[in-house]
């Protein structure tokens, strides 16, 4: 019989017993056992949020000097990070599914751009002439730009280039790569049929027949699957459910052709894509389904190559005005990545004349027309697709440290500036959930929050200085303390200071100190009604000496404190048969003492 595995709460308790409050290890054996059990335990995101084990393990990793323990803790934290990030990506994909506009039967048909509705179908002869044009050898782009693009592609999370294929596989016409239905939407079986599946390339005749067959199928898509909007000439239509990388590049080029201005002659297709692009496309379609924007179904398109050859103006636009700008930028990796693949020198791509080189430029005006520069869109797309990618295993995440002076001025000598670390995940104490950090920029020194805190701190310091400079004797604090306006102001100031966490003492601090002193002096000035304290007697008749007749006369005829009665501070005499009423605190409270002797 094996013991039941410990719950995350029990593991957390064991870890807390093995470390001190500063995360220093007191019991190394127990910490190693906790790490081992956590490595085997299939923990969930909810358990991590409840127990805050990630923070505890990270603190232990920072404090420990055991390198092996630090490595194991880091590996464990990385695995948890991958566990949390895909959950957020899955939620984004589900939101995209909920807001999508599909067909009447729930989107069971395959998602294709409606090529037949936008223009007349091309004849086989026309396709053949285009085919011949595509076989022309193009120019190769410079190595410097390709290196830059390769770096961008690696940042976007794509795996490296695939192994080289023979020149026989560089046929310009590529049939449909089999799409990956990541969201459960079933595709039509005829679109999956491809003669490339077995051999990796196909003859031109089979490709032309298959294109013609696909053009016939393209007229069967329901009308309500694609709803064009007419709000602006270039960007006014919503994104279609299936935006594929190559299709989106061609749509961008067509959009630039359709914008008002001097008309561009429609030339031959700009780029020829080899079968290796379809492999890139498969991996990219898998990632695109994770980062699909709200309102689009992340389903891969089964026939992007039909758009490559026919160059028909597609009704599918690039961006939807109703989507927020950040989400709109998430489409941009699909617009840039095919160009990156074309520019790789290892991939033996041939470009169809100068048309492809000229075709790279219209993407940038399109971005600037949307209100974003290409550099910022590249940075946003890098950030959007950084999580959950395969390249994490190759490229380790190195957090950047930013040095920020919160006062916005030159730091004084001997004062350390605050160091802020950029993190990918953060714990929200309000919702008690672990969330990806949305703010990727360093906190600026001129941000309004810090300016507000800075001004509030300066006000508190000035107030403290003013109150220190004016002594108590110059102000009638007693009258001020009774004023309702002053009291409300002081209470509000006190709550503000406590909420902002400032340690500077304000006027309320000195007021309370003064009131305490006044209270103590007032208590001293009150008349206390108590018994007169008696010093211990030195002359004790009957103990230190013999009892005499004078002692007996004194007991009977005169007042002898402590012997035949007692006296209070107001001069009243009480014998042992009387009740004594006193006010020991000076607050008008009465203390009644019963008689010492009862003569009933």
Curated annotation (Swiss-Prot):
Gene3D superfamilies assigned: Conserved domain common to transcription factors TFIIS, elongin A, CRSP70
Subcellular location: Nucleus
Boundaries of every TFIIS N-terminal domain copy: 10-87
Compositionally skewed regions (Pro residues) per UniProt: 314-324
Entry keyword set: Activator, Nucleus, Phosphoprotein, Transcription, Transcription regulation
Organism listed in the record: Homo sapiens
Stated name of the protein: Mediator of RNA polymerase II transcription subunit 26
Pfam families (UniProt xref): Med26, Med26_C, Med26_M
Family, per entry: Belongs to the Mediator complex subunit 26 family.
Function: Component of the Mediator complex, a coactivator involved in the regulated transcription of nearly all RNA polymerase II-dependent genes. Mediator functions as a bridge to convey information from gene-specific regulatory proteins to the basal RNA polymerase II transcription machinery. Mediator is recruited to promoters by direct interactions with regulatory proteins and serves as a scaffold for the assembly of a functional pre-initiation complex with RNA polymerase II and the general transcription factors.
Keyword Ion transport among record annotations: no
Cross-referenced PROSITE patterns: TFIIS_N
Residues modified as Phosphoserine: 447, 470, 535
GO terms classed as biological process: positive regulation of gene expression; positive regulation of transcription elongation by RNA polymerase II; positive regulation of transcription initiation by RNA polymerase II; regulation of transcription by RNA polymerase II; RNA polymerase II preinitiation complex assembly; transcription initiation at RNA polymerase II promoter
PANTHER family from the UniProt entry: CRSP70, MEDIATOR OF RNA POLYMERASE II TRANSCRIPTION SUBUNIT 26
The protein's assembly and partners: Component of the Mediator complex, which is composed of MED1, MED4, MED6, MED7, MED8, MED9, MED10, MED11, MED12, MED13, MED13L, MED14, MED15, MED16, MED17, MED18, MED19, MED20, MED21, MED22, MED23, MED24, MED25, MED26, MED27, MED29, MED30, MED31, CCNC, CDK8 and CDC2L6/CDK11. The MED12, MED13, CCNC and CDK8 subunits form a distinct module termed the CDK8 module. Mediator containing the CDK8 module is less active than Mediator lacking this module in supporting transcriptional activation.
């Amino acid at each position: 019989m094996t013991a039941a595995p410990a719950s995350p709460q029990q593991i957390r308790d064991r870890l807390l017993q093995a470390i001190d409050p500063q995360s220093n290890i007191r019991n190394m054996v127990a910490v190693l056992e906790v790490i081992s059990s956590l490595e085997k335990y299939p923990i969930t995101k909810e358990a991590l949020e409840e127990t805050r084990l990630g923070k505890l393990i990270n603190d232990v990793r920072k404090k420990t000097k055991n390198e092996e323990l630090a490595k194991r803790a880091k590996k464990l934290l990385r695995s948890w990070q991958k566990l949390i990030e895909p959950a957020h990506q899955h939620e984004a994909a589900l939101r995209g599914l909920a807001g999508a506009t599909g067909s009447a039967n729930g989107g069971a048909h395959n998602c294709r751009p409606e090529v037949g509705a936008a223009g007349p179908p091309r004849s086989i002869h026309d396709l053949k002439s285009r085919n011949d044009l595509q076989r022309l050898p193009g120019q190769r782009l410079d190595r410097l730009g390709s290196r830059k693009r390769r770096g961008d592609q690696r940042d976007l999370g794509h795996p490296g280039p695939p192994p080289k294929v023979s020149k026989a596989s560089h046929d310009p016409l590529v049939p449909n790569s089999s799409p990956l239905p990541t969201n459960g939407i079933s595709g039509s079986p005829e679109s999956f049929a491809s003669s490339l599946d077995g051999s990796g390339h196909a003859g031109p005749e089979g490709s032309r027949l298959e294109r013609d067959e696909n053009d016939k199928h393209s007229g069967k898509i329901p009308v309500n699957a694609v709803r064009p909007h007419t709000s602006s000439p270039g960007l006014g239509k919503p994104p279609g459910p299936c935006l594929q990388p190559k299709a989106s590049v061609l749509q961008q080029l067509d959009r630039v052709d359709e914008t008002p201005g001097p008309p561009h002659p429609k030339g031959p297709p700009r780029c020829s894509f080899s079968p290796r692009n379809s492999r890139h496309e498969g991996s990219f379609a898998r990632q695109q389904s994770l980062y699909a924007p709200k309102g689009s179904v992340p389903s891969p398109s089964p026939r992007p190559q039909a758009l490559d050859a026919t160059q028909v103006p597609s009704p599918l636009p690039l961006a939807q005005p109703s989507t927020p700008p950040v989400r709109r930028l998430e489409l941009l990796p699909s617009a840039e990545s095919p160009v990156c693949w074309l520019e790789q020198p290892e991939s033996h791509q041939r470009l169809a004349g100068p048309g492809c080189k000229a075709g790279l430029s219209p993407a940038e005006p399109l971005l600037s027309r949307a209100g974003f520069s290409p550099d910022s869109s590249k940075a946003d797309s890098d950030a959007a697709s950084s999580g959950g990618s395969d390249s994490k295993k190759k490229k380790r995440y190195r957090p950047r440290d930013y040095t920020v002076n919160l006062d916005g001025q030159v730091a004084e000598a001997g004062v350390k500036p605050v160091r802020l670390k950029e993190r990918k995940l953060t714990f929200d104490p309000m919702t008690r959930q672990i969330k990806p950090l949305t703010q990727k920029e360093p906190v600026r020194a001129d941000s309004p929050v810090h300016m507000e805190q800075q001004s509030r701190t300066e006000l508190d310091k000035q107030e403290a200085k003013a109150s220190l400079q004016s002594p108590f004797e110059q102000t009638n604090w007693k009258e001020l303390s009774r004023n309702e306006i002053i009291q409300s102001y002081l209470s509000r100031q006190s709550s503000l200071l406590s909420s902002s966490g400032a340690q500077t003492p304000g006027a309320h601090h000195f007021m309370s100190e003064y009131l305490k002193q006044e209270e103590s002096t007032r208590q001293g000035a009150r008349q206390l009604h108590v018994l007169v304290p008696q010093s211990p007697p030195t002359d004790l008749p009957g103990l230190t000496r013999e009892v005499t007749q004078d002692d007996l006369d004194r007991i009977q005829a005169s007042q002898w404190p402590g012997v035949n009665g007692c006296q209070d501070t107001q001069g009243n005499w009480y014998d042992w048969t009387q009740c004594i009423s006193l006010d020991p605190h000076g607050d008008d409270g009465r203390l009644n003492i019963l008689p010492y002797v009862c003569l009933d």
